[in-house]
Amino acid sequence: DKETDAKRKEELLQMSKICAKVPYEPANSFREAVQSVWFIQLILQIESNGHSLSYGRFDQYMYPYYMKDINEGKITKEDALELLTCLWIKTLTINKVRSQSHTLSSAGSPMYQNVTIGGQTTDKKDAVNELSFVVLQSVAQTRLTQPNLTVRYHANIDKHFFDECIEVMKLGFGMPALNNDEIIIPSFINWGVKEEDAYNYSAIGCVETAVPGKWGYRCTGMSYMNFPR
């Protein structure tokens, strides 16, 4: 009631309305979906003293909300970009007190929250979409230590998107990481994971991979390379 700026007042009222709705009720817009994802992430962190709690294949499950709002003229790409940069800044605020040695070696006190984009659909088509580009751009703009950004790479990945990934890597802040679908998916299948689930894997923590809500194994040794071999 005390806010005098009309635009800011409208924003605050919209925030209040959204926060009173999600995640108890389903999200119906991109703004609501982003807020719902944040609330769930925060609740999980608090409830479980969380570690390596990751966002999964963000560009896949958020894409329908994004495109619906874009097509209906409710948001622009720039609006979505701003919302995502705000989400990543909030993600960075989740923290734990670490030892001095860990803090020095880990560029602060990261919680190893990971966001996965790219990859393939369950019918083996390239999964890169418009939101994949927006997520990549938002991470490039913020250049934060959290969340980690992982791009699932495969032979038929959108060339323009992969070129953009390389440009972001050249900025020098260590992201995005690349996960090779053509190695990881067969590995999951060899472990007995169903093919449709293997194609839906995402990165968690530093370098681990899992199928969201279905299968996970902290095979941290996957980051080691056998150079002689």
Question: What are these language model-derived features?
Answer:
Residues 5:
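Acidic, metal/cofactor-coordinating or nucleic-acid-engaging core segments within structured domains
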Residues 11-13, 18-229:
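Conserved catalytic cores of very large enzyme subunits
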